[in-house]
Regions:
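FIC/Doc superfamily catalytic core
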Residues: 1-184
């Protein structure tokens, strides 16, 4: 059963990479980009609709009929599409702290956060933060905790879905960035 799941995961990655390379619209890569980006950003409070998210992915433009849009929502949406592509391109590579920081830089580059003196883009947080009233790992402990997490994860030859989920839960608990942890 485990071997069958591993083969399915390899097949899925092959399909994602092939559709990404070919620019095929309407396939699993197209749907994954839109759904993952919309839902990840929506959880974080993005004001963009599913339709606006899809339109940004498909046309790199956005139309607004009524009201206004938060520019950071648009920038982070466009950046998230590039982030997902980079993850797909590097899915078979060893996961490193440098790569994770690169993903954060890609996500937050050009946002108002990137212009704040206290906000670190592309590196771990310098100030303590909390999520839903729960304290996260103190800044001075983040690098060590990330090293432990990555050493544990990278030691596994074949990663199962449970391994990925376990990694994600631990990653979120560390909460190494000032913002953007879940989307990274």
């Amino acid at each position: 059963m485990e071997e069958m799941l591993q083969n399915r995961n390899k097949l899925l990655l092959d399909i994602l990479q092939e559709e990404k390379s070919s620019g095929y619209a309407g396939g699993i890569y197209h749907k994954t980009q839109i759904e993952l980006t919309y839902n990840s950003n929506h959880i974080e409070g993005s004001s963009l609709t599913h339709e606006q998210t899809r339109y940004i992915f498909e046309t790199n433009t956005i139309g607004v009929e009524d009201g206004s849009l938060n520019v950071d929502d648009v920038i982070e949406t466009a950046n998230h599409f590039r982030l997902v592509s980079l993850i797909i391109d590097n899915a078979k590579s060893t996961l490193t702290q440098e790569f994770i920081k690169k993903l954060h830089l890609l996500l937050k580059n050009g946002t108002s956060d990137s212009r704040r003196d206290w906000f670190v883009v592309g590196d771990y947080k310098k100030l303590p933060n909390e999520v839903g009233g729960m304290h996260t790992t103190p800044p001075e402990e983040v690098s060590g905790k990330m090293k432990e997490l990555l050493d544990e994860y990278n030691a596994k030859e074949e990663k199962s879905l449970d391994d990925v989920l376990d990694f994600h839960v631990k990653f979120e608990k560390i909460h190494q960035f000032q913002d953007g942890n879940g989307r990274v």
